[in-house]
Swiss-Prot record:
Annotated protein name in UniProt: Crotonobetaine/carnitine--CoA ligase
Pathway participation: Amine and polyamine metabolism; carnitine metabolism
Family recorded in the similarity comment: Belongs to the ATP-dependent AMP-binding enzyme family.
Any one GO BP annotation for this protein: carnitine metabolic process
Source species: Proteus mirabilis (strain HI4320)
Catalytic activity line of the entry: 4-(trimethylamino)butanoate + ATP + CoA = 4-(trimethylamino)butanoyl-CoA + AMP + diphosphate; crotonobetaine + ATP + CoA = crotonobetainyl-CoA + AMP + diphosphate; (R)-carnitine + ATP + CoA = (R)-carnitinyl-CoA + AMP + diphosphate
A Pfam family per the record: AMP-binding_C
EC id: 6.2.1.48
Catalytic EC class: ligase
Keywords tagged on the record: Ligase
Keyword set includes Ubl conjugation: no
Molecular function GO terms recorded: acid-thiol ligase activity; carnitine-CoA ligase activity; crotonobetaine-CoA ligase activity
Function as written in the Swiss-Prot or TrEMBL entry: Catalyzes the transfer of CoA to carnitine, generating the initial carnitinyl-CoA needed for the CaiB reaction cycle. Also has activity toward crotonobetaine and gamma-butyrobetaine.
Length: 518
Protein backbone atom coordinates (compact mmCIF):
# COMPACT_ATOMS: atom_id res chain seq x y z
CA UNK A 1 0.00 0.00 0.00
CA UNK A 2 1.42 3.38 -1.04
CA UNK A 3 0.50 5.63 1.90
CA UNK A 4 2.36 8.73 0.67
CA UNK A 5 1.28 8.83 -2.98
CA UNK A 6 4.85 8.69 -4.34
CA UNK A 7 5.49 12.16 -2.88
CA UNK A 8 9.14 12.85 -2.04
CA UNK A 9 10.32 15.60 0.31
CA UNK A 10 10.82 18.24 -2.41
CA UNK A 11 7.23 17.87 -3.54
CA UNK A 12 6.07 17.91 0.07
CA UNK A 13 7.63 21.31 0.77
CA UNK A 14 6.48 22.86 -2.49
CA UNK A 15 2.92 21.74 -1.71
CA UNK A 16 3.05 22.88 1.93
CA UNK A 17 4.25 26.34 0.90
CA UNK A 18 1.42 26.64 -1.61
CA UNK A 19 -1.33 25.35 0.69
CA UNK A 20 -0.36 27.02 3.99
CA UNK A 21 1.60 30.00 2.62
CA UNK A 22 1.76 32.64 5.40
CA UNK A 23 0.69 30.32 8.23
CA UNK A 24 3.39 29.94 10.90
CA UNK A 25 5.41 26.77 10.32
CA UNK A 26 8.39 27.10 12.65
CA UNK A 27 9.09 29.06 15.83
CA UNK A 28 12.55 28.76 17.33
CA UNK A 29 13.63 30.02 20.75
CA UNK A 30 17.34 30.14 21.54
CA UNK A 31 18.83 29.46 24.95
CA UNK A 32 19.14 33.24 25.37
CA UNK A 33 15.43 33.74 24.66
CA UNK A 34 15.79 35.09 21.11
CA UNK A 35 12.82 34.05 18.96
CA UNK A 36 12.85 33.47 15.19
CA UNK A 37 9.70 32.66 13.24
CA UNK A 38 9.00 31.41 9.71
CA UNK A 39 5.81 30.92 7.72
CA UNK A 40 5.46 27.89 5.46
CA UNK A 41 6.36 29.93 2.38
CA UNK A 42 9.32 31.59 4.15
CA UNK A 43 10.62 28.26 5.40
CA UNK A 44 10.38 26.77 1.91
CA UNK A 45 12.28 29.77 0.52
CA UNK A 46 15.09 29.27 3.05
CA UNK A 47 15.17 25.57 2.15
CA UNK A 48 15.47 26.51 -1.54
CA UNK A 49 18.28 28.98 -0.83
CA UNK A 50 20.20 26.28 1.05
CA UNK A 51 19.58 23.77 -1.76
CA UNK A 52 20.87 26.27 -4.33
CA UNK A 53 23.99 26.97 -2.27
CA UNK A 54 24.76 23.29 -1.85
CA UNK A 55 24.27 22.60 -5.55
CA UNK A 56 26.46 25.57 -6.50
CA UNK A 57 29.22 24.18 -4.26
CA UNK A 58 29.22 20.90 -6.15
CA UNK A 59 27.02 18.77 -3.92
CA UNK A 60 25.07 16.32 -6.03
CA UNK A 61 22.55 13.53 -5.64
CA UNK A 62 23.80 10.77 -3.35
CA UNK A 63 26.52 12.85 -1.68
CA UNK A 64 26.76 12.55 2.10
CA UNK A 65 26.64 15.84 4.01
CA UNK A 66 27.08 15.82 7.78
CA UNK A 67 25.23 18.27 10.03
CA UNK A 68 26.80 18.95 13.43
CA UNK A 69 24.50 21.55 14.97
CA UNK A 70 22.59 22.42 18.09
CA UNK A 71 18.87 22.99 17.61
CA UNK A 72 18.44 25.88 15.17
CA UNK A 73 16.36 26.78 12.09
CA UNK A 74 19.40 26.21 9.88
CA UNK A 75 19.21 22.50 10.65
CA UNK A 76 15.87 22.40 8.84
CA UNK A 77 17.07 24.61 5.97
CA UNK A 78 19.91 22.14 5.40
CA UNK A 79 17.99 18.91 6.03
CA UNK A 80 15.29 19.63 3.47
CA UNK A 81 17.57 21.64 1.18
CA UNK A 82 19.80 18.61 0.80
CA UNK A 83 16.75 16.41 0.24
CA UNK A 84 15.55 18.70 -2.55
CA UNK A 85 18.73 18.06 -4.57
CA UNK A 86 18.90 14.36 -3.70
CA UNK A 87 21.82 14.61 -1.27
CA UNK A 88 21.93 12.63 1.98
CA UNK A 89 21.93 14.24 5.42
CA UNK A 90 24.13 12.64 8.09
CA UNK A 91 23.23 14.26 11.44
CA UNK A 92 25.91 14.09 14.12
CA UNK A 93 25.14 14.10 17.83
CA UNK A 94 25.88 17.61 19.11
CA UNK A 95 27.58 16.10 22.16
CA UNK A 96 30.17 14.26 20.10
CA UNK A 97 33.81 15.29 20.28
CA UNK A 98 36.59 14.84 17.72
CA UNK A 99 37.09 11.05 17.79
CA UNK A 100 33.37 10.23 17.64
CA UNK A 101 32.68 12.76 14.89
CA UNK A 102 35.72 11.73 12.84
CA UNK A 103 34.63 8.09 13.03
CA UNK A 104 31.26 8.94 11.45
CA UNK A 105 32.80 11.23 8.81
CA UNK A 106 35.23 8.49 7.81
CA UNK A 107 32.71 5.65 8.02
CA UNK A 108 30.16 7.26 5.72
CA UNK A 109 32.72 9.15 3.59
CA UNK A 110 31.15 12.57 4.12
CA UNK A 111 33.00 15.18 2.04
CA UNK A 112 30.96 18.07 3.43
CA UNK A 113 30.02 19.24 6.93
CA UNK A 114 27.65 22.00 8.05
CA UNK A 115 28.46 23.22 11.55
CA UNK A 116 28.64 26.28 13.81
CA UNK A 117 31.30 28.17 15.74
CA UNK A 118 30.78 25.85 18.72
CA UNK A 119 31.88 22.77 16.80
CA UNK A 120 34.18 24.11 14.08
CA UNK A 121 37.36 23.28 16.09
CA UNK A 122 36.40 19.61 15.68
CA UNK A 123 36.47 19.85 11.89
CA UNK A 124 39.28 22.31 11.18
CA UNK A 125 41.94 19.59 11.69
CA UNK A 126 40.02 17.20 9.42
CA UNK A 127 40.16 19.70 6.56
CA UNK A 128 43.94 19.52 6.66
CA UNK A 129 44.17 15.77 7.27
CA UNK A 130 44.98 14.00 4.01
CA UNK A 131 43.42 10.80 5.37
CA UNK A 132 40.05 12.47 6.05
CA UNK A 133 37.38 12.53 3.31
CA UNK A 134 36.28 16.01 4.45
CA UNK A 135 36.89 18.66 1.76
CA UNK A 136 34.48 21.49 2.58
CA UNK A 137 33.10 23.09 5.73
CA UNK A 138 29.93 25.20 5.74
CA UNK A 139 30.21 27.40 8.82
CA UNK A 140 27.16 29.03 10.39
CA UNK A 141 28.54 32.09 12.14
CA UNK A 142 27.69 35.69 12.95
CA UNK A 143 31.40 36.55 12.89
CA UNK A 144 33.39 37.81 9.93
CA UNK A 145 35.21 34.83 8.44
CA UNK A 146 38.79 35.13 7.24
CA UNK A 147 39.39 33.68 3.79
CA UNK A 148 40.28 30.02 4.23
CA UNK A 149 40.36 27.27 1.65
CA UNK A 150 37.55 24.79 2.12
CA UNK A 151 35.46 27.00 4.46
CA UNK A 152 32.17 28.57 3.28
CA UNK A 153 30.27 31.26 5.20
CA UNK A 154 26.88 29.55 5.13
CA UNK A 155 24.70 32.53 6.06
CA UNK A 156 26.22 35.13 3.75
CA UNK A 157 26.57 32.75 0.82
CA UNK A 158 23.04 31.39 1.21
CA UNK A 159 21.66 34.93 1.10
CA UNK A 160 23.13 35.38 -2.40
CA UNK A 161 20.96 32.63 -3.85
CA UNK A 162 17.35 32.95 -5.10
CA UNK A 163 14.31 31.76 -3.15
CA UNK A 164 13.21 29.49 -5.99
CA UNK A 165 14.94 26.19 -6.67
CA UNK A 166 17.49 26.37 -9.48
CA UNK A 167 18.04 22.67 -10.12
CA UNK A 168 15.45 19.89 -10.13
CA UNK A 169 17.31 16.60 -9.79
CA UNK A 170 15.11 13.58 -10.61
CA UNK A 171 13.99 12.11 -7.28
CA UNK A 172 12.26 8.95 -6.13
CA UNK A 173 10.63 8.21 -2.79
CA UNK A 174 12.98 5.23 -2.61
CA UNK A 175 16.06 7.47 -2.64
CA UNK A 176 18.10 7.69 0.56
CA UNK A 177 17.46 10.97 2.39
CA UNK A 178 19.37 10.38 5.61
CA UNK A 179 21.86 8.15 7.38
CA UNK A 180 21.21 8.42 11.11
CA UNK A 181 23.72 6.78 13.41
CA UNK A 182 22.30 5.02 16.45
CA UNK A 183 23.28 6.22 19.90
CA UNK A 184 25.68 3.35 20.53
CA UNK A 185 24.97 3.09 24.26
CA UNK A 186 26.25 -0.49 24.29
CA UNK A 187 28.37 -0.76 21.12
CA UNK A 188 29.72 1.11 18.09
CA UNK A 189 26.93 3.11 16.38
CA UNK A 190 25.37 1.80 13.17
CA UNK A 191 24.20 4.01 10.30
CA UNK A 192 20.44 3.61 9.83
CA UNK A 193 19.55 4.29 6.18
CA UNK A 194 16.32 6.30 5.87
CA UNK A 195 14.49 7.05 2.60
CA UNK A 196 12.25 9.87 1.41
CA UNK A 197 9.36 7.43 1.80
CA UNK A 198 10.35 6.72 5.42
CA UNK A 199 10.26 10.41 6.32
CA UNK A 200 7.00 11.16 4.50
CA UNK A 201 5.39 8.12 6.11
CA UNK A 202 6.62 9.24 9.54
CA UNK A 203 4.81 12.53 9.08
CA UNK A 204 1.52 10.83 8.27
CA UNK A 205 1.86 8.11 10.92
CA UNK A 206 2.86 10.28 13.87
CA UNK A 207 0.25 12.93 13.01
CA UNK A 208 -2.37 10.15 13.06
CA UNK A 209 -1.03 8.86 16.38
CA UNK A 210 -1.37 12.32 17.96
CA UNK A 211 -4.56 13.20 16.04
CA UNK A 212 -2.78 16.38 14.92
CA UNK A 213 -4.66 19.21 13.19
CA UNK A 214 -3.44 22.36 11.47
CA UNK A 215 -4.41 24.47 14.50
CA UNK A 216 -2.12 22.44 16.78
CA UNK A 217 1.10 23.82 18.26
CA UNK A 218 3.66 21.07 18.78
CA UNK A 219 6.52 22.09 21.11
CA UNK A 220 9.67 20.06 21.63
CA UNK A 221 13.13 20.43 23.09
CA UNK A 222 14.39 17.12 21.72
CA UNK A 223 17.55 17.49 19.60
CA UNK A 224 17.01 17.95 15.88
CA UNK A 225 19.68 15.35 15.08
CA UNK A 226 17.57 12.68 16.79
CA UNK A 227 14.89 10.50 15.16
CA UNK A 228 12.37 11.64 17.75
CA UNK A 229 12.52 15.34 16.89
CA UNK A 230 12.48 14.54 13.20
CA UNK A 231 9.83 11.82 12.91
CA UNK A 232 7.70 12.15 16.05
CA UNK A 233 7.59 15.95 16.26
CA UNK A 234 8.62 18.10 13.29
CA UNK A 235 7.48 16.01 10.31
CA UNK A 236 4.02 15.23 11.72
CA UNK A 237 3.53 18.90 12.60
CA UNK A 238 4.57 20.05 9.14
CA UNK A 239 2.59 17.31 7.39
CA UNK A 240 -0.72 18.68 8.70
CA UNK A 241 0.16 22.37 8.49
CA UNK A 242 0.53 22.79 12.25
CA UNK A 243 3.02 25.08 14.00
CA UNK A 244 6.24 23.49 15.22
CA UNK A 245 7.99 25.14 18.18
CA UNK A 246 11.63 24.15 18.69
CA UNK A 247 13.58 25.10 21.81
CA UNK A 248 17.36 25.20 21.64
CA UNK A 249 18.02 23.82 25.11
CA UNK A 250 16.05 22.19 27.90
CA UNK A 251 15.71 24.13 31.12
CA UNK A 252 13.66 22.62 33.94
CA UNK A 253 12.99 26.12 35.27
CA UNK A 254 11.83 27.50 31.91
CA UNK A 255 10.17 24.56 30.13
CA UNK A 256 6.68 24.75 31.59
CA UNK A 257 6.67 28.54 31.21
CA UNK A 258 7.44 27.97 27.53
CA UNK A 259 4.55 25.51 27.29
CA UNK A 260 2.28 28.30 28.57
CA UNK A 261 3.95 31.06 26.52
CA UNK A 262 3.44 29.31 23.18
CA UNK A 263 0.08 27.76 24.14
CA UNK A 264 1.38 24.36 23.09
CA UNK A 265 -1.24 21.69 22.48
CA UNK A 266 1.18 18.77 22.11
CA UNK A 267 4.62 18.20 23.62
CA UNK A 268 6.87 15.34 24.66
CA UNK A 269 8.81 14.55 27.80
CA UNK A 270 11.44 11.92 28.49
CA UNK A 271 11.64 10.58 32.07
CA UNK A 272 14.57 12.84 32.95
CA UNK A 273 12.47 15.87 32.03
CA UNK A 274 9.50 14.67 34.07
CA UNK A 275 11.65 14.11 37.15
CA UNK A 276 13.32 17.50 36.94
CA UNK A 277 9.98 19.23 36.30
CA UNK A 278 8.53 17.55 39.38
CA UNK A 279 11.47 18.92 41.39
CA UNK A 280 10.54 22.52 40.51
CA UNK A 281 8.51 24.70 42.91
CA UNK A 282 4.76 24.51 42.29
CA UNK A 283 3.45 27.44 40.25
CA UNK A 284 -0.18 28.60 40.64
CA UNK A 285 -0.70 28.73 36.86
CA UNK A 286 1.04 25.49 35.85
CA UNK A 287 -2.30 23.79 35.12
CA UNK A 288 -3.50 26.69 32.95
CA UNK A 289 -2.13 25.18 29.75
CA UNK A 290 -3.71 24.01 26.50
CA UNK A 291 -1.96 20.64 26.28
CA UNK A 292 -4.10 17.75 25.12
CA UNK A 293 -1.27 15.24 24.69
CA UNK A 294 2.12 14.74 26.32
CA UNK A 295 4.14 12.07 24.54
CA UNK A 296 6.30 10.13 26.98
CA UNK A 297 8.68 7.23 26.76
CA UNK A 298 10.18 4.47 28.87
CA UNK A 299 11.40 4.22 31.59
CA UNK A 300 8.89 5.63 34.10
CA UNK A 301 7.55 4.11 37.31
CA UNK A 302 3.78 4.06 37.94
CA UNK A 303 4.14 6.39 40.92
CA UNK A 304 6.10 8.93 38.88
CA UNK A 305 3.57 8.87 36.04
CA UNK A 306 0.60 9.30 38.35
CA UNK A 307 2.26 12.13 40.27
CA UNK A 308 3.09 13.98 37.04
CA UNK A 309 -0.47 13.64 35.73
CA UNK A 310 -1.92 14.85 39.02
CA UNK A 311 0.38 17.85 39.38
CA UNK A 312 0.21 19.19 35.82
CA UNK A 313 -3.28 17.96 34.87
CA UNK A 314 -2.14 16.36 31.62
CA UNK A 315 -2.88 13.26 29.59
CA UNK A 316 0.08 11.04 28.71
CA UNK A 317 0.42 9.17 25.42
CA UNK A 318 3.03 6.43 25.27
CA UNK A 319 4.69 4.92 22.24
CA UNK A 320 7.46 2.44 21.62
CA UNK A 321 9.92 2.54 18.78
CA UNK A 322 13.56 2.89 17.81
CA UNK A 323 15.58 4.55 15.09
CA UNK A 324 15.12 1.50 12.87
CA UNK A 325 11.32 1.64 13.12
CA UNK A 326 11.28 5.36 12.20
CA UNK A 327 8.21 6.00 14.42
CA UNK A 328 6.66 4.75 17.64
CA UNK A 329 4.99 1.84 15.88
CA UNK A 330 3.50 0.39 19.08
CA UNK A 331 1.60 2.88 21.17
CA UNK A 332 -1.63 4.40 22.37
CA UNK A 333 -4.02 4.76 19.44
CA UNK A 334 -6.28 7.77 18.92
CA UNK A 335 -9.52 7.18 20.80
CA UNK A 336 -8.23 3.91 22.27
CA UNK A 337 -8.07 3.05 25.95
CA UNK A 338 -4.71 3.58 27.63
CA UNK A 339 -3.45 0.82 29.82
CA UNK A 340 -0.12 1.80 31.39
CA UNK A 341 2.25 0.07 31.95
CA UNK A 342 1.29 -1.32 28.53
CA UNK A 343 3.14 0.37 25.67
CA UNK A 344 0.01 -0.02 23.54
CA UNK A 345 -0.76 -1.87 20.34
CA UNK A 346 0.70 -1.76 16.81
CA UNK A 347 -0.57 0.99 14.54
CA UNK A 348 -1.49 0.79 10.87
CA UNK A 349 1.03 -0.82 8.48
CA UNK A 350 2.69 -2.74 11.33
CA UNK A 351 2.52 -6.12 13.05
CA UNK A 352 4.19 -7.24 16.27
CA UNK A 353 4.95 -10.59 17.94
CA UNK A 354 6.80 -11.91 20.96
CA UNK A 355 9.33 -14.59 20.00
CA UNK A 356 11.69 -16.94 21.81
CA UNK A 357 15.38 -17.57 21.12
CA UNK A 358 14.42 -20.08 18.43
CA UNK A 359 12.49 -17.30 16.65
CA UNK A 360 9.15 -18.92 17.43
CA UNK A 361 6.12 -16.96 18.62
CA UNK A 362 5.37 -17.53 22.32
CA UNK A 363 1.99 -17.65 24.11
CA UNK A 364 0.47 -14.52 25.61
CA UNK A 365 2.00 -13.58 28.95
CA UNK A 366 5.37 -15.17 28.18
CA UNK A 367 8.38 -12.85 28.01
CA UNK A 368 10.40 -12.92 24.80
CA UNK A 369 11.89 -10.65 22.16
CA UNK A 370 9.66 -7.96 20.68
CA UNK A 371 9.68 -8.45 16.91
CA UNK A 372 7.90 -6.07 14.55
CA UNK A 373 6.98 -6.28 10.89
CA UNK A 374 6.91 -3.50 8.35
CA UNK A 375 8.25 -2.78 4.88
CA UNK A 376 11.98 -1.96 4.68
CA UNK A 377 12.63 1.43 3.13
CA UNK A 378 9.01 2.45 3.69
CA UNK A 379 7.72 1.78 7.21
CA UNK A 380 11.02 0.40 8.53
CA UNK A 381 14.58 1.51 7.85
CA UNK A 382 16.11 0.32 4.60
CA UNK A 383 19.38 -1.13 5.92
CA UNK A 384 22.46 -0.41 8.01
CA UNK A 385 24.96 1.60 5.99
CA UNK A 386 27.81 -0.63 4.77
CA UNK A 387 26.84 -3.30 7.34
CA UNK A 388 25.11 -6.14 5.47
CA UNK A 389 26.01 -8.47 8.35
CA UNK A 390 24.17 -6.32 10.89
CA UNK A 391 21.25 -5.81 8.51
CA UNK A 392 20.87 -9.56 7.98
CA UNK A 393 21.01 -10.21 11.72
CA UNK A 394 18.32 -7.65 12.57
CA UNK A 395 16.03 -7.70 9.55
CA UNK A 396 14.46 -10.83 8.06
CA UNK A 397 13.74 -10.95 4.30
CA UNK A 398 9.98 -10.82 4.90
CA UNK A 399 10.21 -7.59 6.92
CA UNK A 400 10.38 -8.87 10.50
CA UNK A 401 12.74 -6.76 12.61
CA UNK A 402 14.40 -8.12 15.75
CA UNK A 403 14.42 -5.21 18.20
CA UNK A 404 16.62 -6.74 20.89
CA UNK A 405 14.00 -5.71 23.45
CA UNK A 406 12.17 -8.04 25.82
CA UNK A 407 8.45 -7.84 26.47
CA UNK A 408 5.18 -9.74 26.45
CA UNK A 409 1.64 -9.49 25.07
CA UNK A 410 -1.65 -9.86 26.93
CA UNK A 411 -4.84 -11.55 25.73
CA UNK A 412 -6.26 -8.30 24.32
CA UNK A 413 -3.25 -7.58 22.13
CA UNK A 414 -1.60 -4.99 24.37
CA UNK A 415 2.19 -5.13 24.57
CA UNK A 416 4.38 -4.62 27.63
CA UNK A 417 8.06 -3.66 27.65
CA UNK A 418 10.32 -5.49 30.09
CA UNK A 419 13.87 -4.42 29.17
CA UNK A 420 16.58 -4.39 26.56
CA UNK A 421 18.05 -7.86 26.08
CA UNK A 422 21.46 -6.34 26.86
CA UNK A 423 19.91 -4.86 30.01
CA UNK A 424 18.88 -8.20 31.51
CA UNK A 425 21.06 -9.49 34.33
CA UNK A 426 21.56 -13.24 34.73
CA UNK A 427 21.70 -13.84 38.48
CA UNK A 428 21.75 -17.33 39.94
CA UNK A 429 19.50 -18.73 37.21
CA UNK A 430 17.07 -15.80 37.35
CA UNK A 431 16.66 -13.16 34.63
CA UNK A 432 16.53 -9.77 36.33
CA UNK A 433 15.39 -6.60 34.57
CA UNK A 434 17.52 -3.53 35.21
CA UNK A 435 14.52 -1.28 34.57
CA UNK A 436 12.44 -3.03 37.23
CA UNK A 437 15.14 -2.47 39.84
CA UNK A 438 15.78 1.10 38.68
CA UNK A 439 12.09 1.98 38.99
CA UNK A 440 11.96 0.70 42.56
CA UNK A 441 15.13 2.54 43.58
CA UNK A 442 13.94 5.74 41.85
CA UNK A 443 10.88 5.79 44.11
CA UNK A 444 13.10 6.63 47.10
CA UNK A 445 12.44 10.31 47.94
CA UNK A 446 16.15 11.11 48.34
CA UNK A 447 17.19 9.61 45.00
CA UNK A 448 17.19 11.78 41.86
CA UNK A 449 18.63 9.33 39.32
CA UNK A 450 19.74 5.71 39.15
CA UNK A 451 21.24 3.14 36.80
CA UNK A 452 21.78 -0.57 37.39
CA UNK A 453 24.24 -2.87 35.61
CA UNK A 454 25.43 -6.46 35.88
CA UNK A 455 29.02 -7.15 36.90
CA UNK A 456 30.82 -10.51 36.81
CA UNK A 457 30.22 -12.81 39.78
CA UNK A 458 32.03 -16.14 40.15
CA UNK A 459 29.16 -17.73 42.06
CA UNK A 460 25.92 -16.33 40.59
CA UNK A 461 26.85 -15.44 37.00
CA UNK A 462 26.37 -11.73 37.59
CA UNK A 463 26.09 -9.43 40.57
CA UNK A 464 23.97 -6.28 40.54
CA UNK A 465 25.55 -2.86 40.95
CA UNK A 466 23.60 0.38 41.35
CA UNK A 467 24.81 3.88 40.51
CA UNK A 468 22.83 6.48 42.43
CA UNK A 469 22.52 10.26 42.17
CA UNK A 470 20.98 11.90 45.23
CA UNK A 471 18.65 14.88 45.29
CA UNK A 472 20.63 18.06 45.90
CA UNK A 473 21.31 18.54 49.60
CA UNK A 474 20.27 15.03 50.61
CA UNK A 475 22.41 12.31 52.19
CA UNK A 476 21.88 8.56 52.20
CA UNK A 477 24.11 5.92 53.73
CA UNK A 478 24.86 2.62 52.04
CA UNK A 479 23.15 0.85 54.94
CA UNK A 480 19.96 2.85 54.44
CA UNK A 481 20.10 2.25 50.69
CA UNK A 482 20.38 -1.53 51.04
CA UNK A 483 17.69 -1.58 53.73
CA UNK A 484 15.29 0.21 51.35
CA UNK A 485 16.06 -2.28 48.57
CA UNK A 486 15.55 -5.29 50.87
CA UNK A 487 12.16 -3.95 51.92
CA UNK A 488 10.94 -3.35 48.37
CA UNK A 489 12.25 -6.16 46.16
CA UNK A 490 12.97 -9.87 46.14
CA UNK A 491 16.27 -10.83 47.72
CA UNK A 492 17.87 -11.97 44.45
CA UNK A 493 17.16 -8.51 42.95
CA UNK A 494 18.85 -6.52 45.72
CA UNK A 495 22.06 -4.88 44.43
CA UNK A 496 25.33 -6.21 45.78
CA UNK A 497 27.06 -2.85 45.48
CA UNK A 498 26.17 0.82 45.23
CA UNK A 499 28.18 3.81 44.03
CA UNK A 500 27.01 7.35 44.69
CA UNK A 501 27.73 9.76 41.81
CA UNK A 502 27.18 13.42 40.93
CA UNK A 503 25.55 12.49 37.62
CA UNK A 504 25.08 9.70 35.08
CA UNK A 505 26.36 9.67 31.49
CA UNK A 506 23.38 10.05 29.16
CA UNK A 507 22.88 10.36 25.44
CA UNK A 508 20.70 12.92 23.66
CA UNK A 509 17.49 10.97 24.26
CA UNK A 510 18.12 10.59 27.98
CA UNK A 511 19.29 6.97 27.89
CA UNK A 512 22.09 6.13 30.30
CA UNK A 513 25.28 5.17 28.44
CA UNK A 514 25.94 2.06 30.50
CA UNK A 515 29.18 1.15 28.76
CA UNK A 516 30.64 4.17 30.60
CA UNK A 517 29.68 2.67 33.96
CA UNK A 518 31.74 -0.05 35.65
Amino acid sequence: MDVIGRQHLRQMWDDLAEVYDKKTALIFESAQGKVRQFSYSELNEEINRAANLFHACGIKKGDHVALHLDNCPEFFFCWFGLAKIGAVMVPINARFMYEESAWIINHCQAHFVVTSDNFSPIYQPMLHDKHSPLTQLFLITENCLPTEQGVVDFLSEKAKHPVTLNHHTPLSVDDTAEILFTSGTTSQPKGVVITHYNLRFAGYYSSWQNALREDDIYLTVMPAFHIDCQCTASLPAFSVGATFVLLEKYSARAFWKQILKYQATVTECIPMMMRTLMAQPVSPDEKQHKLREVMFYLNLADEEKDAFIERFNVRLLTSYGMTETIVGLIGDRPGDKRRWPSIGRPGFCYQAQIRDKQNQQVPNGVVGEICVKGEPGKTLFKEYYNRPDATEKALEPDGWLHTGDYGYQDDEGFFYFVDRSCNMIKRGGENVSCIEIENIIASHPKIQDVAVIGVPDDIRDEAIKAFVVLVDGETLSEEAFFAFCEQNMAKFKVPSAVEFKQGLPRNCSGKVIKKHLQ
